[in-house]
Regions:
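N-terminal, positively charged/glycine-rich alpha-helical extensions of SAM-dependent methyltransferases
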Residues: 1-22, 182, 186
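C-terminal alpha-helical "lid/dimerization" subdomain adjacent to the S-adenosyl-L-methionine
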Residues: 10-11, 158-212, 222
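Conserved alpha-helix/loop element of class I SAM-dependent methyltransferases that forms part
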Residues: 32-50
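Class I SAM-dependent methyltransferase SAM/SAH-binding core
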Residues: 53-111
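A short acidic, Gly/Pro-enriched loop at the edge of an enzyme's catalytic core
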Residues: 110-121
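A short SAM/SAH-binding and catalytic strip from SAM-dependent methyltransferases
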Residues: 120-134
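A short glycine-rich, Lys/Arg-flanked "PGG" loop and its adjoining helix->strand segment in the class I
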Residues: 135-150
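Core SAM-dependent methyltransferase catalytic element
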Residues: 216-240
Length: 240
């Protein structure tokens, strides 16, 4: 791939790529079992049907892609920049018997290899923290969705109010300790996630991200904080 990759993007790929085989298991553990519930809420926002084709961006190990097919009976194209994650995802798709419904490809969200309005809906997870320009990325994502198609995202978030001190305690101390108990690689993830999440939302308040969606031509943007604010789902509809 010839396009330049941002340093934060490159660092995230180097951090997570070796963990593909264990990613889903320990993502569930480190999120206190909330990750599957968040994914289900994300998938439900699309409100689509069986005769649709959905693009799953930053698909990783294909967990969302598989859930989309099981929920809607649709077809899914999943893209991710990590060959290692895609290899795990393809194995999971085969085990699930969904190879005819799900196709996984290597691609980056900032430069999608698809024509305009190619998909009926789009999901992306844990993505915007790793791109240099959220507005440009949202425009690229919206470009490949037909007018009237749903777009939905999931990411970690920073709780407000009384939940904030507990969150800070967990990401500063709990996550690194739990990660190191699993493996050195997961220890690095545990130390990385808190500053990554906090730094992104400090630099890009949710109102700014919603503005990026609207600037990309996405209408009716809504959001829901999950698990006392530890997760965030945004969704909206591609305008005409």
């Amino acid at each position: 791939m010839t396009e330049s990759i941002s340093e934060r993007n490159r660092a995230a790929q180097a951090l997570f790529a070796p963990l593909g085989e264990s990613y889903d298991r320990y993502a569930r553990l480190l999120s206190f079992g909330q990750d599957p519930r968040w994914r289900a809420f994300l998938v439900d926002r699309l409100e689509t049907g069986p005769e649709t084709t959905i693009l799953d961006v930053a698909c990783g190990t294909a967990a969302v892609s598989i859930e989309l097919v099981r929920r809607y009976g649709c077809r899914v194209v999943g893209v991710d920049q990590s060959p290692e994650m895609l290899a795990v995802g393809r194995a999971r798709v085969d085990i699930a018997g969904l190879g005819e419904r799900i196709r996984l490809e290597e691609a980056r969200a900032e430069h999608l290899p698809f024509e305009d309005a190619s998909f009926d809906a789009l999901t992306f997870t844990y993505l915007l923290r790793y791109v240099d320009d959220p507005v440009a990325t949202m425009k690229e994502l919206a470009r490949v969705v037909r007018p009237g198609g749903r777009i939905a995202m999931l990411d970690f978030f920073v709780p407000a109010g009384v939940a904030r001190p507990a969150w800070e305690l967990y990401v500063r101390f709990g996550l690194p300790v739990l990660g190191r108990a699993v493996s050195p690689g997961w220890g690095e993830v545990g130390s990385f996630l808190g500053p990554s999440i906090r730094g992104f939302w400090d630099d890009h308040p949710v109102e700014e991200i919603v503005g990026a969606w609207r600037e990309a031509g996405i209408d009716g943007v809504e959001g829901r904080r999950l698990s006392l604010g530890g997760g965030l789902v945004l969704w909206g509809t591609r305008g005409a």
